[in-house]
Amino acid sequence: MAASRAPRRRLEDLSVDEFLASGFESGSESELEGAAEERRARGAAWNRERRGARTSPGPAGRLRKGRASEHKDQLSRLKDRDPEFYKFLQENDRSLLDFSDSDSSAEEEEPFHSLPDTLEEASETEEDGGEDSDALPRGLRSKKNEPVPVTLAMVERWRQGSRHHLTPRLFHEVVQAFRAAVATTQGEQEAAETCRFQVADSAVFNALVTFCIRDLCGCLQKLLFGKTPKDSNRLLLPSSSPLWGKLRVDVKSYLSAVVQLAACLAEATVSAAVLQHISSLVPYFLTFPKQCRMLLKRMVVLWSTGEESLRVLAFLVLIRVCRHKKEAFLGPILKQMYIMYVRNCKFTSPSTLPLISFMQRTLTEMLALDPSVSYQHAFLYIRQLAVHLRNAMTTGKKETHQSVYNWQYVHCLYLWCRVLSTLGSSEILQPLLYPLSQIIIGCIKLLPTARFYPLRMHCVRALTLLSQTIGTFIPVLPFILEIFQQVDFNRRPGRMSSKPINFSVILKLSSTNLQEKAYRDGLLEQLCDLILEYLHSQAHSIAFPELVLPTVLQLKSFLRECKVANYCRQVRQLLEKVQENARHIESLRQSATFSVSDRTAVDAWEKQVREEGTPLTRYYGHWKKLRDREIQLEISGKERLEDLNFPEIKRRKVEDRKDEDRKELKDLFELDSSEGEDSTDFFERGVPRLPEAHQGLKEDQEEEDKEEGDSDSEDGDTDTGVDLSELWQLAQGAQDELEDLQLSEED
């Protein structure tokens, strides 16, 4: 110990043996250590002086300074007493040795907090995060920016809380969870990660969406307005509620999420439930113009392309929004709906025709909301139709003709005829009647050939619809009667057709169709229907006898020239009803006491006749019922045919089929005596008796011959078929007769 504590000599005073025994400790190292100790001592003294200047002198300050210096002295004594242990502490626990007075003062002063010089303002996201973290129940708070998984228990708790008493904080939680559920359906991973909640289970998704669709709107309405108002038809804007300021942001987020959900659903039943929920949320959408435009855009798409029930619900939402916000939304929505209508009318078939008719009627109802706005759109689009027709008439090219003779053009004519017939009483739209009727007449006269008779019939129906409701005379009958003069109904058809022609879904006939018998059958039926429909609208007119005179003459001329019994029967029945109605009007006119120039008296007389009814109107009502029933049966028959499960034909293997065929042939050639006895009954009374299969064939042949005979008689042909028994007799030949030869006297 004495040797260790003795002062160390310098290197130059040591011998070689002493230097090697000293453990390679140089004097420079000891000098460096001494200098380091001096620096630490000066630093500690400076820190003590600084702390003494900061803090007021007192017993607590002196106590802290004494503890620090005492601990430091203990470490220095440990270094002298046990240098090996001190070295061990340096290598393994350096923090214990690097102790200064500042550390002790920092620990003692830690409970005290000093404010920074500048304060930062909190952002909206931080505020939301703080509110959300406070609103979450204990045990569900997770790490920062980590979404909370939604469970069925949470959804049930939200449902019970909303039914009992909905609060703004609870509504905020439900909206955040609903947004997370919608984000998962759209596949937006970034949006789902930014949400506060996470919906990963399909059962939780269904429960949450069902709760929001069924219960949330009613609870929100109760929270805003309390009791339901007595006048349920009156629209209550949620902005009038005193709580609207607290709920406005959450309601806006919820409406955006609902529109996104309606856009991504594929199941018709679920989409229908969401659309019904949207219909109840219309007052909230009216408060936010941006969300309302998003909603209307989506509803127009569903109205034009969705399933039938979805189309109806989407239209109800559209008309409800436009009824309350005509100035803001009616004009753009009418334009968008017309564009979608034209786009969906490009092709027409029996399956798409009801949907096109639905779009016509609903678009007409939208145009009826404001006649002044409707006039602007009607004038623009009717003028566009007139420009297409003028180009086709002036150039005469095939391309320009195709721009007129297509389904889109024809359905647009139908639409505006329906609109003007519905709003014809409005003085704003009356100036458009004459241009529209002239466009339709020009469309008929563009190519007046037999191939475009179906298109002519569509135009005639549009003119009839226009003339029925507005009370304006339009010369429709000449375009119908002209066909009787152009078509030869007595001409024998070039080929037989397998099915009738549906004139309601075609615009043009092919050259093959013009040679078929079904073409003339369907054409005559369509002509009789068109005459009946137009004359039904004029049956109460005081000038009906004079109006139908050209028609009566043309029908009588047809009956004199036509030789087909079926055609004559249809025309004769129509002619009788027209003449009966003319005689009825003449008998009523004889008892009239007013002059024909008295317009008021004439209108009153025609109104009375319409209310009482005429023979032609009663016949038309009965005919219309039968025709609608035929159409329904045809549609239902097609549906049954589609749903019918035809039996499968199970083909046998080649080996099995050969074995069975050999067995059948073997049994066939093994003749018994009974078969020989039965074969004697083949001839009876000198006339061959046919087997049962041949007898059935004979009956079928007789029925076919009978049908062919009827059809030939209708076409003016008198040829008859040959019976199978007659063919058999002809093959047998007549019995030979022996006659005496008579020789003349000259031989």
Swiss-Prot record:
Subcellular location(s) of the protein: Nucleus, Nucleoplasm; Nucleus, Nucleolus
Tissue specificity annotation: Ubiquitous.
Gene: Noc2l
UniProt record similarity statement: Belongs to the NOC2 family.
UniProt keyword list: Apoptosis, Nucleus, Phosphoprotein, Repressor, Transcription, Transcription regulation
The protein's role, per its UniProt record: Acts as an inhibitor of histone acetyltransferase activity; prevents acetylation of all core histones by the EP300/p300 histone acetyltransferase at p53/TP53-regulated target promoters in a histone deacetylases (HDAC)-independent manner. Acts as a transcription corepressor of p53/TP53- and TP63-mediated transactivation of the p21/CDKN1A promoter. Involved in the regulation of p53/TP53-dependent apoptosis.
GO function term, MF aspect, one: p53 binding
Acidic residues compositional bias, start-end: 100-110, 118-134, 670-681, 700-720, 736-747
Region described as Disordered: spans on this chain: 23-84, 98-145, 669-747
Keyword Nucleus: yes
Protein's name according to its UniProt entry: Nucleolar complex protein 2 homolog
